Amino acid sequence: MDDHKTASPPRERSYETPPAERPITDAEAARAAALSANEHIKIASGYLRGTLADGLLKHATGAISDDDGQLVKFHGMYLQDDRDLRAERTKKKLEKAYSFMIRLRIAGGVVSPKQWLALDEIARTYANGTLRATTRQTFQYHGVIKSNLKRTMQAIDAVLLDTIAACGDVNRNVMAATNPAQTGAHKAAYQLAKTISDTLLPKTNAWREIWLDGERVVGGEDEAVEPIYGKTYLPRKFKIVVAVPPSNEVDIFAHDLGFIAILDKKNKLKGWNVTVGGGMGMTHGETDTFPRTADVMAFCEPEDALKVAEAVMTVQRDWGNRKSRKNARLKYTIERYGLAAFRAEVERRVGRKLQDPKPFRFESNGDRYGWVEGEDGRHHLTLYLPSGRIKDVEGGPRYLSGLRRIAEVHQGDFRLTGNQNVIVANVPADRKSEIDALVAEYGLNLGVTALRRNSLACVALPTCGLALAESERFMPGLLTELEESLAAHGLQDEDITIRMTGCPNGCARPYIAEIGFVGRGPERYNLYLGAAFDGSRLSKLYAEDVAAKDIRATLDPLFAAYARDRQPGERFGDFVIRAGFVAKTINGPDFHDRTGALKAVA
């Protein structure tokens, strides 16, 4: 891949003047300014309390109020229902089969064996019997009913974990590089992620009051209760990652804020390149919404990284769009006011000028499977988890039971990756054989083909309320079909990134996959092609509203052309652009421009 050295050259255009005031926190003023409904909910919430405590006591329903449904996200939960059962329950005049998805906050994705065992027990006791590793280095539970919410949260708290700010208009879970070979750099990345996570955590006591029956803390001025966020928190979600080249397994260009480790020849940290303005979500048919890859804005010294993180987030707090949530992410803020103005304001808040970015190079955004020895002599085993779902498969791998057994004997830690996989980390050399025996006994090393190890899928149906099509449940069968097609053209060992989401919000980051599927409706998908293998370039729409049954037939001629006409070492995403099947996407606003994407497959 090309070296990434500087921010994208600015397009010649005029930008708006940034606002000079802090966000509106008065209810009357918010109404007069026509702020979004969520802003009113936050203002009236009493720092994220709302009526959640009372709603939990209403046993006649498995749901909570609509306003509390927005606030509970800040506590790490989404209200969902089983969409497979909707029609049947409606016919019987029953309430929807409500339950909650619970997402943990695990900075850097590191958990101890003790914590793993506790999380496993929670899954089997209160959730649907599975754990799900997410695309952002944490766990989700599905199927937790309202009456079990407090018990679940208290069990999570008992092993020194929580779900605070795992969702909502706040800084979300902070990701960090997991590359096990670069032990020192990984430690620096993890420490920065953990420090940022702790510093930017909401300070309201609402989570402990509601879920742990803690004593209510009397509120005061905004600066006392929430010194960073204030009463209205952020305009929208905010995601931070820390990467260590040459691996981009955290997909740094897909996030609001990123730190890229700049290392010397001895792999010692010199500082961080700072990226801003990435994000995946969009809305079908609305071209003023788009995914965007982050700009490489500047370089900062190690001691300034935390100040930069807080400055970037608070500029977004003050400048972000609070009228239209679809245009509220940092990517739109930078498009609206310009990168130069944004950097200048960040520097003003940091109190010093930042340096220009340093050269760096990413080579891939996938995981390194199997055993890897770190610089410190410890060993790390990366295991593939299909779509991140940790469960026992009948007649196949027993992920839940096998990882439970490993946790019972493991003396190191576990690391979740941004690709929905898990690393059994920090294993002494003399304990490798014990881990290998358990991996073999439970079949945990089965089915890791080239295509599967580069695949991601969101949960989608039946639990996600936003899903327009299947994803996790459909992906395995589709991969089998596409593997057959690739093998027919001698491409079975080619690494090609492939991702699927059930809606355009892009949780599995499909717009930076070489092959991306985005749900349009039941069994129908938009097909995107042409992203960079290292995650640094967006894809382009190749075919719209493709029936699920036609996906293989649509891609097979492209695989044939790739096998026949590719250049040495050429990646699939680069090939489809050079061959003229799709136009190259420069960045976000260019995403919807399909000019040049009209070549028919020979």
Curated annotation (Swiss-Prot):
<feature type="binding site">
    <location>
        <position position="464"/>
    </location>
    <ligand>
        <name>[4Fe-4S] cluster</name>
    </ligand>
</feature>
<feature type="compositionally biased region" description="Basic and acidic residues">
    <location>
        <begin position="1"/>
        <end position="15"/>
    </location>
</feature>
<feature type="region of interest" description="Disordered">
    <location>
        <begin position="1"/>
        <end position="24"/>
    </location>
</feature>
<dbReference type="GO" id="GO:0051539">
    <property type="term" value="F:4 iron, 4 sulfur cluster binding"/>
</dbReference>
<dbReference type="InterPro" id="IPR036136">
    <property type="entry name" value="Nit/Sulf_reduc_fer-like_dom_sf"/>
</dbReference>
<dbReference type="GO" id="GO:0000103">
    <property type="term" value="P:sulfate assimilation"/>
</dbReference>
<keyword id="KW-0479">Metal-binding</keyword>
<dbReference type="GO" id="GO:0046872">
    <property type="term" value="F:metal ion binding"/>
</dbReference>
<dbReference type="GO" id="GO:0009337">
    <property type="term" value="C:sulfite reductase complex (NADPH)"/>
</dbReference>
<comment type="subunit">
    <text>Alpha(8)-beta(8). The alpha component is a flavoprotein, the beta component is a hemoprotein.</text>
</comment>
<dbReference type="Pfam" id="PF01077">
    <property type="entry name" value="NIR_SIR"/>
</dbReference>
<dbReference type="GO" id="GO:0004783">
    <property type="term" value="F:sulfite reductase (NADPH) activity"/>
</dbReference>
<dbReference type="Pfam" id="PF03460">
    <property type="entry name" value="NIR_SIR_ferr"/>
</dbReference>
<keyword id="KW-0411">Iron-sulfur</keyword>
<dbReference type="InterPro" id="IPR045854">
    <property type="entry name" value="NO2/SO3_Rdtase_4Fe4S_sf"/>
</dbReference>
<keyword id="KW-0004">4Fe-4S</keyword>
<dbReference type="GO" id="GO:0050661">
    <property type="term" value="F:NADP binding"/>
</dbReference>
<dbReference type="InterPro" id="IPR045169">
    <property type="entry name" value="NO2/SO3_Rdtase_4Fe4S_prot"/>
</dbReference>
<feature type="binding site">
    <location>
        <position position="503"/>
    </location>
    <ligand>
        <name>[4Fe-4S] cluster</name>
    </ligand>
</feature>
<keyword id="KW-0198">Cysteine biosynthesis</keyword>
<dbReference type="GO" id="GO:0020037">
    <property type="term" value="F:heme binding"/>
</dbReference>
<keyword id="KW-0560">Oxidoreductase</keyword>
<dbReference type="InterPro" id="IPR011786">
    <property type="entry name" value="CysI"/>
</dbReference>
<comment type="pathway">
    <text>Sulfur metabolism; hydrogen sulfide biosynthesis; hydrogen sulfide from sulfite (NADPH route): step 1/1.</text>
</comment>
<protein>
    <recommendedName>
        <fullName>Sulfite reductase [NADPH] hemoprotein beta-component</fullName>
        <ecNumber>1.8.1.2</ecNumber>
    </recommendedName>
</protein>
<comment type="function">
    <text>Component of the sulfite reductase complex that catalyzes the 6-electron reduction of sulfite to sulfide. This is one of several activities required for the biosynthesis of L-cysteine from sulfate.</text>
</comment>
<feature type="binding site">
    <location>
        <position position="507"/>
    </location>
    <ligand>
        <name>[4Fe-4S] cluster</name>
    </ligand>
</feature>
<dbReference type="GO" id="GO:0019344">
    <property type="term" value="P:cysteine biosynthetic process"/>
</dbReference>
<dbReference type="GO" id="GO:0070814">
    <property type="term" value="P:hydrogen sulfide biosynthetic process"/>
</dbReference>
<feature type="binding site">
    <location>
        <position position="458"/>
    </location>
    <ligand>
        <name>[4Fe-4S] cluster</name>
    </ligand>
</feature>
<keyword id="KW-0408">Iron</keyword>
<keyword id="KW-0349">Heme</keyword>
<keyword id="KW-0521">NADP</keyword>
<feature type="binding site" description="axial binding residue">
    <location>
        <position position="507"/>
    </location>
    <ligand>
        <name>siroheme</name>
    </ligand>
</feature>
<dbReference type="InterPro" id="IPR006067">
    <property type="entry name" value="NO2/SO3_Rdtase_4Fe4S_dom"/>
</dbReference>
<dbReference type="InterPro" id="IPR005117">
    <property type="entry name" value="NiRdtase/SiRdtase_haem-b_fer"/>
</dbReference>
<dbReference type="InterPro" id="IPR006066">
    <property type="entry name" value="NO2/SO3_Rdtase_FeS/sirohaem_BS"/>
</dbReference>
<comment type="similarity">
    <text>Belongs to the nitrite and sulfite reductase 4Fe-4S domain family.</text>
</comment>
<dbReference type="GO" id="GO:0050311">
    <property type="term" value="F:sulfite reductase (ferredoxin) activity"/>
</dbReference>
<keyword id="KW-0028">Amino-acid biosynthesis</keyword>
